[in-house]
Amino acid sequence: MVKYSTDPANPTKSAKAMGRDLRVHFKNTRETAFALRKMPLNKAKRYLEDVLAHKQAIPFRRYCRGVGRTAQVKNRQPNGQGRWPAKSAKFVLDLLKNAESNAEVKGLDVDALYISHIQVNQAQKQRRRTYRAHGRINPYMSNPCHIELILSEKEEPVKKEAESHIARKA
């Protein structure tokens, strides 16, 4: 059985999905996942489809050195740095669709689902080599990642009872 880093608050009202050793850049995928945290499922899927169509950009916050600015990120991040990581968006979108299917099988309300947990971890690096001048060899590494996410149903807040007026002693 696969171990997740966290357990959902209500396991009967949540669905999980995980991808391991995915050949997609860790840094781009981390920024993509961070942009989707706590987002409703339908909104997240629409957002990733817009990223693939270059209508909205992913804001780059941590791994942002050398990342250019774009007006599409102005309202989501102060310095406006962002990109359109297509491969990362496609992998995360596929994982969201997988989790949605898992939720349908469990009988959950798909319209009420939101991303309660999404996490990207570094996987083992894959080593290749490139041949350089004068007989030297340099490493040619790829940085794959593991992605895990949990979709949960929004819980309706319990309504507070109307206070009954109790006469106080004076």
UniProtKB/Swiss-Prot annotation:
Pfam families: Ribosomal_L22 (PF00237). GO terms for molecular function: structural constituent of ribosome. GO terms for biological process: cytoplasmic translation; hematopoietic stem cell homeostasis. Keywords: Ribonucleoprotein, Ribosomal protein. PROSITE patterns: RIBOSOMAL_L22. It comes from the Eukaryota. InterPro entries: Ribosomal_uL22 (IPR001063), Ribosomal_uL22_CS (IPR018260), Ribosomal_uL22_euk/arc (IPR005721), Ribosomal_uL22_sf (IPR036394). One of its GO terms (cellular component) is cytosolic large ribosomal subunit. Belongs to the universal ribosomal protein uL22 family. This is Large ribosomal subunit protein uL22z. It comes from Hordeum vulgare. The lineage of its organism: Eukaryota, Viridiplantae, Streptophyta, Embryophyta, Tracheophyta.
